[in-house]
């Protein structure tokens, strides 16, 4: 006689009927008699119909190097699921590439694409019932999109990231192309040199080999507990990644049989762990939009102030580009996420659950015993570097105040984001003259034609979520950071966002944005801008070049607001119309209703 268990002991939607614990897919199968013949029409065997059904969702497509190789990994995950007694079904939600969208209006689709991919995965998962899933992605919007979808559909889930591409000749990496483009525009390198750099910056598949948004979000996926330990940001060309994908398929079946949902793993403590790791790696500022958006799907409150609080006093350890010296493929060689966590484990919640069915603390102990670090060392030896050349020890950090700060003031009442670890020390406190522009194109032109001088604050507005979809200001930051005269003497302020490859004095996500009447819309030429990163201040302290009181600034702002024309979106149909009408503040995650 089978033993009946209480439904409350089954965290997944397991239906108890006639003494048998029935997976949801099997119950729905009885309600939809067409399901079996349709699956048999795809070549399924009769015994496959009764197995745990595993969604194998990837962003595979010939869209960019981060996704072009994911089909092989998805097939490995499906093979693993089959070997563990499940049946995988491959689904695809191809992503776009921010790099290919740069320099034209295509970049306006970047952030909206995150939400659209999450929607498509929700449709895939819920239109055909699955008992668990393996989710595969590599890059800026695809990783957070699938993590958002996991939170929304809340099934047993394992994440596999597509790893990182190799560096090119002389350790050339893609984020340097923006710098070389600006140098070419200024006549500092030849066309032949520029062409060589372009043709050799991406020698393999995988995410771009620097600590940009793609690499950061791969690390965040593991930090949340949804990946097998040590599998984030592996070299995309190594066999270890295929093995990890196969193992993920097996793990997804095990989680489905246990009924362990994603929400049983991802908690507020998980997000706090991810933020501490983010501080240690000096991760992309875009994480401040992606993690809150993911947390929203898990019904967990998370705001930008949590990042600011946790980054204060956090030790920054990672010597990887763009803030550091080495390409991102070396991160795995040095021990990857587990090595970072080992260094900061006194500041982590080690009792959080992970997809292994063990706690984070147990996983870290297992890795010390199973040869993981020794295997990483075999890769590292080929570089001639030591582990501490890549990941510093907690007692010998690169910095001791994290990487991110949230600034506030009469320009950004709801906040603005700066990666202070990438800002020259002389710009941590500055008084600058405002040079406002209503689009990025005009600002870039002014910089490249030497209209911007030391002591200026370049302000780019109407580029927030409600303005234009919140594109990246990558070329502007590269034009500034590659100019020796400007890189440590001016600042960029915007309600838009930055590429994870950006460096230099760049302050973004200014909220409220100009399109919603935020004070950034009221700034005029030669207003005086005060930046004080240690005190977390961003404000106008003078009008037309003359310092004045806060009350006088507010009086002038009130007068200017009366003359400010209402914002009119240029998008009248399609995705960008929907996004710019419904997107939330970047301080809340910039997600679309």
Give the label of every model feature segment.
Residues 2-4:
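Position-driven detector of the extreme protein N-terminus
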Residues 110-119:
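Glycine-rich, highly charged phosphate/nucleotide-binding loops
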Residues 125-146, 157-161:
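A short, small-residue-rich loop immediately preceding and capping a beta-strand
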Residues 19-66, 73-93, 99, 105-110, ...:
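Catalytic or ion-coupling anion/metal-binding cores of large enzyme and transporter domains
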Residues 7-21:
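Short, Lys/Arg-enriched N-terminal segments with co-localized hydrophobic residues
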């Amino acid at each position: 006689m089978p033993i009946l268990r209480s439904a409350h002991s089954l965290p997944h939607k397991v239906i108890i009927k006639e003494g048998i614990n029935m997976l949801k897919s099997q119950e729905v199968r009885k309600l939809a008699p067409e399901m079996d013949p349709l699956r048999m029409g795809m070549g399924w065997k009769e015994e496959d119909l009764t197995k745990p059904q595993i969604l194998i969702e990837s962003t595979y497509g010939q869209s960019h190097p981060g996704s072009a190789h994911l089909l092989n990994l998805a097939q490995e995950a499906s093979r693993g699921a089959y070997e563990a007694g499940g049946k995988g079904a491959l689904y695809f939600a191809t992503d776009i590439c921010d790099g290919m969208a740069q320099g034209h209006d295509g970049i306006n689709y970047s952030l909206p694409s995150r939400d659209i991919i999450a929607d498509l995965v929700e449709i895939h998962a819920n239109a055909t019932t699955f008992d668990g899933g393996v989710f595969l992605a590599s890059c800026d919007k695809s990783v957070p999109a699938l993590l958002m979808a996991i939170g929304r559909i809340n099934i047993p889930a394992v994440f596999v990231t597509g790893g990182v591409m190799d560096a090119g000749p002389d350790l050339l990496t893609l984020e340097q192309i923006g710098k070389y483009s600006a140098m070419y525009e200024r006549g500092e390198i030849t066309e032949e040199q520029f062409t060589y750099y372009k043709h050799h910056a991406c020698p393999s598949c995988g995410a771009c080999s620097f600590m940009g948004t793609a690499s950061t979000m791969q690390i965040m996926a593991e930090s949340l507990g949804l990946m097998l330990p040590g599998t984030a940001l592996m070299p995309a060309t190594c066999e270890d990644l295929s093995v990890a994908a196969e193992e993920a398929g097996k793990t997804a079946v095990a989680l489905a049989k246990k009924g362990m949902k994603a929400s049983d793993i991802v908690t507020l403590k998980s997000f706090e762990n991810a933020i501490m790791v983010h501080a240690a790696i000096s991760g992309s500022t875009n994480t401040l939009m992606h993690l809150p958006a993911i947390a929203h799907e898990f019904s967990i409150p998370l705001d930008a102030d949590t990042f600011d609080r946790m980054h204060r006093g956090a030790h920054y350890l990672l010597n990887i580009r763009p803030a550091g010296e080495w390409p991102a493929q070396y991160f795995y060689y040095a021990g990857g996420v587990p090595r970072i966590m080992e260094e900061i484990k006194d500041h982590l919640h080690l009792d959080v659950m992970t997809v292994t069915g063990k706690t984070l603390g147990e996983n870290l102990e297992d890795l010390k015993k199973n040869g993981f670090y020794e295997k990483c060392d075999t890769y590292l030896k080929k570089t001639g570097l030591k582990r501490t050349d890549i990941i510093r020890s907690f007692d010998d950090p690169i910095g001791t105040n994290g990487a991110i700060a949230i600034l506030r003031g009469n320009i950004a009442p709801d906040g603005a984001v700066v990666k202070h670890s990438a800002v020259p020390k002389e710009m941590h406190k500055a008084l600058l003259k405002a040079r406002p522009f209503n689009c990025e194109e005009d600002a870039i032109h002014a910089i490249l034609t030497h209209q911007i001088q030391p002591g200026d604050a370049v302000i780019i507005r109407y580029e927030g979520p409600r303005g234009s979809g919140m594109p990246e200001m990558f070329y502007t930051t590269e034009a500034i950071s590659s100019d020796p005269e400007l890189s440590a003497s001016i600042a960029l302020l915007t309600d838009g966002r930055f590429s994870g490859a950006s460096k230099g004095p760049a302050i973004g996500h200014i909220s409220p944005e100009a399109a919603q009447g935020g004070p950034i819309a009221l700034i005029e030429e030669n207003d005086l801008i005060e930046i004080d990163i240690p005190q977390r201040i961003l404000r106008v302290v003078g009008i037309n070049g003359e310092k004045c009181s806060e009350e006088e600034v507010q009086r002038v702002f009130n007068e200017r607001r009366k003359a400010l024309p209402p914002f009119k979106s240029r998008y009248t149909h399609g995705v960008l119309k929907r996004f710019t009408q419904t997107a939330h503040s970047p301080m809340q995650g910039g997600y679309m209703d």
